[in-house]
Structure formats: C-alpha cells, structure tokens
C-alpha cells in the first residue's frame, strides 16, 4: 500500500509539469528532453488520447515498458499491477493479458517470475486451476507446465510438484499417473528421466519392474532387463549392475535363442 501511495504522490507532482501545457509546448520543456525519441513518442501518444501518462513518463522505464503501460491505460485497465520498472516489457505483457481476461493477476506480479513463468500461471488461472501449487519462484516454467498439465487432468500432482524433481522427471511421473500406473516405484529423484521411462514402460506392460528399479542400473541396462522380462526370460542371469548393457544384450539374445529351440 505504501508503494502505491508513493506512486500516487509522484504522479501528482508530475501532472503539474504538463497539466496546463499544450502537447506542442510540452515537447519544448527540459523535462521532455530527458527522454529518448522512442520514449517521447510513447508520451505523445498517451497525451493525444488524454491518458494519465504520469504512470509511465519516467526515466526508469524503457520505451517498450512505456508502451505496455500506455496500452493498458488505453484499455482502462488498472496498470498499478504492473507499473513497476523491475518488470520487463514481456512480464508486463503477461500481466496486461491477465487483466484483459479479468484474472487475479496479483498471484503472479512478483518480478521473480519471468514472463514464461507468468504465462504458465496465467494459463492455469484461465482454466480455474489451483495455481498456488506451482506459483512458486523456484519452479522453472517447464516444471510449472508439467504441474499445470497434471492439474488440468485432475492428477495427484503432489507426487511430483516438488523441488527435488526436474521437468523431465515430472513428465515421466505425470505420464504414469495419466495411465493410472503405480508411479510410486519410480517417483524418486534418484532416478533420472530415462530410468523413470524404462520403469514406466515396464509397469505399463504389467512386468515386475521392481526387479530393475535400482538406481545402480543405467537406463540401457534397465532396457535390456525390461525386454528380457517382456520375453519371459530368466533375467536373474544378467540383472547385475556390474554387467554392461552390451553384455546384458548378448546374454539376453542367447537366452532368447535357447527359448525358441525348446
């Protein structure tokens, strides 16, 4: 509230500079010459439409920021939500879009949210999702997207909406939940996305993925064990993390050949 009050006081002071001046005379003032050509154009455009340019006729704003504020004023929006020089013009645009759609933009006006993060929060608000689950600065925009998609599909996002997971790990957990799989077997930050994928494939096929749900196996080793299980082979003969995936493949192929000869 104090910040907004200070802005109003500053705006009132600035109004005195041009309230009684024509646009032509205003352009001849020392104050006007503080701004570069592009900034001056934004001020003139605002004045020509009788806008309260005191919101943006300030040196701390670039002309692109001024433009976003001017457009907001033209649309009769409450630009106080984004009249902040700490926000980039792209962040301002996301807040502007939210205001146009009558969303509660206060949830994402924090400058710590870059424009891409703001977009994910805005998209969630547009679908009436509980964006508080992911409207947190420590999530990347990609992580926010995975949580948003999970909320959209009514999934238990609490299983992966955590700082411990990156966006690719979140994706694997989300895809498993979407297919009603028991993701608890691999919803573990110790597994990388490729390992999670192999476990998801195994669970999806109804295989005993617990046999290779060990972080010591890399994804290629997991794949060979999974393919062995798929073909009803005795994978215990090569399910050893000390055996390379190439050796595992050789053993697997040998077991497959023997099984066809029976």
What is each of the regions a protein language model found here?
Residues 2-262:
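General marker for long, soluble alpha-helical cores
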């Amino acid at each position: 509230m104090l910040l907004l009050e200070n802005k109003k006081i500053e705006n009132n002071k600035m109004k005195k500079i041009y309230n009684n001046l024509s646009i032509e005379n205003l352009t001849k003032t020392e104050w006007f010459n503080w701004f570069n050509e592009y900034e001056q154009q934004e001020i003139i455009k605002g004045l020509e439409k009788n806008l309260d340019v005191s919101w943006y006729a300030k040196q701390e704003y670039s002309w692109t920021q001024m433009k976003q504020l001017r457009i907001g004023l033209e649309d009769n929006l409450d630009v106080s939500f984004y009249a902040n020089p700490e926000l980039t013009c792209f962040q301002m645009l996301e807040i502007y879009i939210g205001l146009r759609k009558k969303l509660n933009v206060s949830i994402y006006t924090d400058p710590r949210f870059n424009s891409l993060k703001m977009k994910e929060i805005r998209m969630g608000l547009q679908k009436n999702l509980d964006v508080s689950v992911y409207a947190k600065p420590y999530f990347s925009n990609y992580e926010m997207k995975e949580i948003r998609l999970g909320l959209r599909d009514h999934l238990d996002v609490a299983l992966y909406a955590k700082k411990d997971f990156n966006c690719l790990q979140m994706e694997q957990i989300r895809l498993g939940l979407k297919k009603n799989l028991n993701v608890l077997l691999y919803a573990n930050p110790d597994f990388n996305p490729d390992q999670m994928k192999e476990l998801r494939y195994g669970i999806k096929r109804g295989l005993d993925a617990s046999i290779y749900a060990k972080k010591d196996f890399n994804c290629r080793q997991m794949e060979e064990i999974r393919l062995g299980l798929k073909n009803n082979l005795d994978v215990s003969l090569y399910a050893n993390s000390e055996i390379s995936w190439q050796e595992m493949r050789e053993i697997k192929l040998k077991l497959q050949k023997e099984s066809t000869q029976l």
